[in-house]
UniProtKB/Swiss-Prot annotation:
It catalyses: Hydrolysis of proteins to small peptides in the presence of ATP and magnesium. alpha-casein is the usual test substrate. In the absence of ATP, only oligopeptides shorter than five residues are hydrolyzed (such as succinyl-Leu-Tyr-|-NHMec, and Leu-Tyr-Leu-|-Tyr-Trp, in which cleavage of the -Tyr-|-Leu- and -Tyr-|-Trp bonds also occurs). The active site is at 109 (nucleophile), 134. Belongs to the peptidase S14 family. This is ATP-dependent Clp protease proteolytic subunit. The lineage of its organism: Bacteria, Pseudomonadati, Pseudomonadota, Alphaproteobacteria, Rhodospirillales. The gene is clpP. Cleaves peptides in various proteins in a process that requires ATP hydrolysis. Has a chymotrypsin-like activity. Plays a major role in the degradation of misfolded proteins. One of its GO terms (molecular function) is ATPase binding. One of its GO terms (cellular component) is cytoplasm.
Amino acid sequence: MIDRDPIDVFNNTLVPMVVEQTNRGERSYDIYSRLLKERIIFLTGQVHDGVASLICAQLLFLESENPSKDISFYINSPGGVVTSGMAIYDTMQYIRSPVSTVCIGQAASMGSLLLCAGEAGKRYATPNARIMIHQPSGGFQGQAADIEIQAREILALRERLNRIYVKHTGQPLETIERAMDRDNYMTAEESRAFGLTDSVIERRALSDDGDTKSSS
């Protein structure tokens, strides 16, 4: 018997379908596709190339639909592959649409970098969310020359990630380097004080026209 990816099992069997009434009758969507119509994107679980490709495609699609309207990006992730996360990060910076980020559950490692990379003033965490930052890690094997090459690469990645955190948090480089030396867990309030987020949100308020919007 072939073991199935638990994420595939989840997506294929546990994601609910919603039915929408249209002029042409009923139309069914999986819940994430329906939320995409409302410009809502989710990152759940590990960050890898497959997930990154889907999220980048959704960001580009929503920009093509309306480049001036906000995109809401909900994050509940332990992190994952650095280069995959950087693909999402670069796409967030590339598109014209403002990206509002919200941490629900956890945003660790690359998840925290994507959280802080949202539009300034529109980066949120829910009260019980946990945020964790740390330096990149990896295991290498092979000839000494190969290990040396990989070590230089991971040090370069660390420097690049540090400078991205500096850009989005406003913290000096020395503070970021110290904070990321080991696993550094933060509460929602601590992440706000550090500059990873802008507000802690408990519930959404109703705007004057009846639409919901985030409140801090």
